Amino acid sequence: MQGSECAKFLTEKIQNLKIAVIGDVMLDRYFYGDVKRISPEAPVPVNHVKRIESVLGGAANVAANLAHLGCQAYIGGVTGDDANRKLLEDMFDKAGIDYSGLIKSSKRATVTKMRIIGATQQMLRLDFEEVGDLLPEETPIMNEWLANLFDQGLDGIIISDYAKGVCSDDFCQKVIKTANAYHVPVLIDPKGAQWEKYRGADFITPNLKEMCEAAGKAVANEDKPVLPVHKEARELYGIRNVVVTRSEKGMTLVGEKDFSLHSPATAQEVFDVSGAGDTV
């Protein structure tokens, strides 16, 4: 796709697409401040917080990116019944994201990542999370929500897996098989080396390390050695297209019939890489 074609797709075609994002929803919180002294209580810096920012994270960030492009985005997952859930709801409302598939659970907390920033330096990250599969009473709720979306008409599904429990083997396979029956493409943002649960998906977007682990081979980050591992991973798990991110080398796509395409990267100075993989 040439630059002009890509621009036309982003401005005209994508705006009417209905995309469901299923996965691990998170809240990212940033505490920005200045560090000018060491605490008298312990040998640690004191951060004088000046500003707090909350943003959608994990699968929620994927939905936010889609909404920003003009898609009708639907989010499915599970959060706690807590104040951080309310922050997420407010941001979903503002972004125009449908969160009717976001289960509110009294048995877990909303996954939250708190980052402490001094000037432009991230000093510390605090994670608040309880990892666990969907509860027996939650799975039917997710299935019913997804079935209604299929009946209404979906253009695509994204499974955003952060290994927090929503994207279990059985649930991923049910989503993929149902989507295949409706001829709805499925894109996977994977976690870990066990890709069997993603079998039958249309696209998967690992980084180079994840792809090598899934294929059981380590290769240098160069075009020639990367392509065969692409092909092997794709065929091993029955995934139609593999799009691997390669840091400063850009991205490489390998699809059916040995189709391949490389997109180089543009170097930029980055202070916070969180959310970069979701954006891909």
Identify the role of each PLM range:
Residues 66, 273-280:
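Short, small-residue alpha-helix embedded
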Residues 150-166:
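Short acidic, glycine-rich surface-loop motifs adjacent to enzyme active sites
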Residues 164-260:
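Conserved phosphate/ATP/ADP-binding segment of small-molecule kinases
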